[in-house]
Structure formats: structure tokens, C-alpha cells
């Protein structure tokens, strides 16, 4: 399985719940926290500590959307589902802030942005997508160890970029690479992401 953002959480659940059917897990947003009984900076490099600073900035300036979607998704949904401009503003703001681009500059085309906004608008699915934060967020994150091989593709400007030592507390890490790019890796750096996935598949000897 492969995933980033919510896909990373879902991928972990799949690996945990269906170990006989999931032979490997590749993540491009690795969710991991420091071990409670160790120095959180133990076995971390200076470069990894620098990447961790992105998360601190995100916590200070970027989690407003998360708190709203986690606590009042239905209220938010009425407004976004009623206004294409409001919906576009809610989504496009993330594209500006979460890509590895210069300030106030998109790194994907307007056509790609409009296609994504249109997906939510014409299907009227923005409300159900925000409810995901409420309905699944209440469950919390599972810290059960994953025995299947795991590959981490860390993109330097992602919202969460924990050090490998943290990930190894939960996952069976067999591959760990750092790439240029931000949160939406598949849009921004498709070549880097796909090459990382292919390298992992080769390690699993399934092709």
C-alpha cells in the first residue's frame, strides 16, 4: 500500500489490520512521534532536525483548517458547498502554503488546480471529505508496530517530516530517502515519488 496525508494513516491501518494481504507499506508523509522514554533528538541528524522545524511552523500557523474540519465539518461544508469561490479559496490556499515553491507562486498549473476544485464542486463532496477529520480523527492514531517492510519518502517541505529514528519505533524501515518538494508530492514531484516507490517494489521482489 502507498499513501500520503490521510492515505498514510489509512495505509498503516491496512498493514496493521490485514498483515496477510499487505506485504509492504510506502509512505510519503510519515506519521511518527518521539519515543516517550528517550531523548527525542537521539540518533537524529542536523538535517532531520531542520526538517522537524517545518512541523513547528505548521502547528503555529497552519492548523486552523484542521481544527475546523475536525470539530465543525458540517457547518463549514454548508458554506463551501454553496460557493465555488469559497471552495476554491479553501483549497487553493493549501496549494500556496504546502508546496515547495516561492511565496505566492503555484508550482502546478491553473488547469490542475481547477480540475481538483471541480472534482469537489461537481460531485458536491467537500462536506463528506471534511467529515473524515471528525469521524476518523476521534479514533486517534494507532501506535501498533508494523512488521511489514516500510519505505519512507520524506519531502523536505512536507507538513510532517519526522526523523528515521522515530519511524523505526513503529515501522520496519527498509528504505528511507529525502527529496525536494512539499506536501503534495504526487502533483509536485511525480518522478521522484514514482522512482522511490519502484525502488521499494524491487526490494520486495514482487516484480
Set out the residue ranges of the language-model regions.
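C-terminal subdomain of alpha/beta-hydrolase-fold enzymes, centered on the catalytic histidine
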Residues: 69-207
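Generic detector of intrinsically disordered, low-complexity, polar/charged segments
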Residues: 1-4, 21, 61, 76, ...
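Extended alpha-helical regions
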Residues: 11, 28, 55, 61-62, ...
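The feature captures the conserved acid-bearing segment of alpha/beta-hydrolase catalytic domains
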Residues: 41-72, 142-145, 168
Amino acid at each position: 500500500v502507498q499513501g500520503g496525508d490521510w492515505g498514510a494513516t489509512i495505509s498503516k491501518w491496512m498493514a496493521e489490520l490485514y498483515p496477510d494481504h499487505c506485504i509492504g507499506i510506502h509512505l510519503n508523509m510519515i506519521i511518527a512521534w518521539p519515543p516517550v522514554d528517550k531523548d527525542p533528538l537521539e540518533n537524529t541528524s542536523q538535517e532531520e532536525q531542520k526538517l522537524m522545524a517545518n512541523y513547528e511552523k505548521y502547528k503555529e500557523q497552519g492548523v486552523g483548517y484542521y481544527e475546523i474540519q475536525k470539530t465543525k465539518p458540517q457547518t463549514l461544508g454548508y458554506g463551501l458547498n454553496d460557493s465555488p469561490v469559497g471552495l476554491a479559496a479553501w483549497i487553493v490556499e493549501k496549494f500556496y502554503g504546502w508546496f515547495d515553491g516561492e511565496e505566492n507562486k503555484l508550482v502546478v498549473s491553473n488547469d490542475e488546480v481547477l480540475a481538483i476544485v471541480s472534482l469537489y464542486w461537481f460531485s458536491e463532496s467537500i462536506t463528506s471529505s471534511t467529515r473524515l477529520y471528525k469521524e476518523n480523527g476521534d479514533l486517534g492514531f494507532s501506535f501498533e508496530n508494523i512488521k511489514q517492510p516500510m519505505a519512507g519518502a520524506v519531502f523536505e517541505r512536507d507538513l510532517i517530516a519526522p526523523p528515521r529514528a522515530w519511524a523505526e519505533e513503529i515501522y520496519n524501515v527498509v528504505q528511507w530517502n529525502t527529496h525536494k518538494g512539499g506536501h503534495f508530492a504526487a502533483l509536485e514531484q511525480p518522478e521522484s515519488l514514482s522512482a522511490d516507490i519502484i525502488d521499494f517494489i524491487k526490494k520486495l521482489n514482487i516484480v
